[in-house]
Amino acid sequence: MNNCLRALMMDPLLMGAFRMNLLTERVDIVKDLGWKRDEIAFNDSDMSHLMMFLERFYGLTNDKHIQRALDVVVTKNQYHPICDYLDGLEWDGQERIRYVLHHFLGADESEITYESVKMFLLGCVHRVFVPGCKFEYMLCLVGDQGAGKSSFFRFLAIRDEWFSDDLKKMDDENVYRKMHGHWIIEMAEMLGTASAKSVEEIKAFLSRAKETYKTPYAKYPRDRKRQCAFVGTSNKQRFLPLDRTGNRRFLPVQIDSSKAEVHVLESEDESRAYIDQLWAEVMVIYRSGEWSMKFRPEIAKHLDIHRLAFMAEDTTTGVIQAWLDNYKGDYVCSRLIYNEALKNYGDPDRKSVNEINDIMNNTIDGWLPGPSSHRFGAPYGSQRAWHREGVKEPVPDKDGFISVAESYDQLKIPFDV
């Protein structure tokens, strides 16, 4: 094996030819070795040519020794093509993060668009420099077919082999292999046709930092830290399911191709040069260390409001909010809302209670959950309650209850319950 090592490391032709690609986790041949090749990755044909070369010039024929020597050589000679690309960029000082989606796709030049794009691009960079880092966001472009959404993401990935749109189903047994070796992965229209259950699966999928699986010829499974980021495209405006917790992993941006300065495919060279400088700007921010993988609280709040325009319509919230805006009391409970606001009779079932709690805790303006149980009087009795924002919480009695009968008496019950 030592003789094989010497040949691979000292022969003028072979020296430096073999490198371990940390993105694909495959051996790459990075120089011309004199035989015809169709791809950079080392394959069975390359091994045959290498063995023939070593036998002819060095008399080395033990294929196991050659393979082990090659493993040692590439372990010492690793590289990451995306990191090398990013490290080699030099920014010209012109701001592009703020304008890129307007330039190519006609998106508004809003602060929300800027913060969403910046977060996503920094996440892409962080994922290749720190594989497996926590990054849960998906940038979603929403707009007409033919606007160039997928082409933009393909160009954003720089090389076609660093981009994939082959991830169609979350339950595909080959889903992890389809992710491997790619930087930006598009889930085209997956959200637009997804059910609430499948969207929850997508959220869980986005939250993972690694995959554990065994390749076909490996003996044991191993952890593979994620180096990719996910993007979404949709022609459907309200592509997000109703989720009153906010669908926070998704960063939707509305595009309008009629307002774009240029179509991304109009001049490929100019588009790619623009995107090179986009990544150069991102790297200046990344190297500064003045960034975070979390949105500032005020931006996160605006994003929650922004996402509502892309979610399925929430009619129940509107009914409850309108009723509360005209309600004279300062305290409400779920059963009171069920009977009075939603005009239902009797006791609510668990599903209805959970929905009301979800609405009151996440989407209603001007009301806060109270820390104690409240006595509402007949027919509601003691209930967990919400109080009007700005109302000072009274002191609970010795049993931990607060009487709100006076507020409740202001209501006129139009029916028996």
Residue ranges and their predicted role:
Residues 324, 331, 336-358:
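Conserved helicase/translocase motor-coupling segment
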Residues 175-180, 215-233:
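AAA+/SF3 P-loop NTPase mechanochemical coupling elements
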Residues 199-222:
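Conserved catalytic/switch belt of AAA+ P-loop NTPases
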Residues 240-260:
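A short helix-turn-beta junction within AAA+ P-loop NTPase domains corresponding to the substrate/partner-engaging
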Residues 1-95, 111, 115, 346-351, ...:
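N-terminal nucleic-acid engagement/recognition segments and initiation subdomains in replication
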Residues 285-329:
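Conserved alpha/beta core segments of nucleic-acid transaction machinery
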Residues 183-206, 241-246:
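Conserved AAA+/SF3 P-loop NTPase catalytic/coupling segment centered on the Walker-B
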Residues 70-180, 184, 335, 342:
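P-loop NTPase catalytic core of nucleic-acid-dependent motor ATPases
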